[in-house]
Curated annotation (Swiss-Prot):
Topology class, membrane: Lipid-anchor
Composition bias, Polar residues: 1-19
Keyword Cytoplasm found: no
Function: Plays a crucial role in virion assembly and budding. Expressed late in the virus life cycle, it acts as an inhibitor of viral transcription and RNA synthesis by interacting with the viral polymerase L. Presumably recruits the NP encapsidated genome to cellular membranes at budding sites via direct interaction with NP. Plays critical roles in the final steps of viral release by interacting with host TSG101, a member of the vacuolar protein-sorting pathway and using other cellular host proteins involved in vesicle formation pathway.
Pfam families: zf-P11
The keyword Zinc-finger is annotated on this UniProt entry: yes
Any one GO cellular component localisation term in the record: membrane
Organism: Junin mammarenavirus (JUNV)
Protein known as: RING finger protein Z
Taxonomy, superkingdom: Viruses
Location of region: Disordered: 1-20
Amino acid sequence: MGNCNGASKSNQPDSSRVTQPAAEFRRVAHSSLYGRYNCKCCWFADTNLITCNDHYLCLRCHQVMLRNSDLCNICWKPLPTTITVPVEPTAPPP
C-alpha cells in the first residue's frame, strides 16, 4: 500500500549532465586594443575576474549569480563552477 513509485527509482548518477571546463581566474586584467576588461555585470571591477562564456565577471557578481541560479544573468548560459588560477610571473624573466 501507499506510494509504490518511490521504491522503483534507482540511485544512478545523472549521465546527461555535461561537465564544464574550468573557468580562468585573473587577478589583473589584460590590457587590450579596445581598453581594459571589466566585469560585465557591475562594470566597476577590473581585478579578480572570472571568464564566463564570452565576457568577464568579478568574484562578487559571480557569487551573487550562483546564489540565485545556475545560469548567468547576462548570457543565459551555465555559470562556471570550477575555477583555475594560472601561474603568473611575479618578476620579468632574466
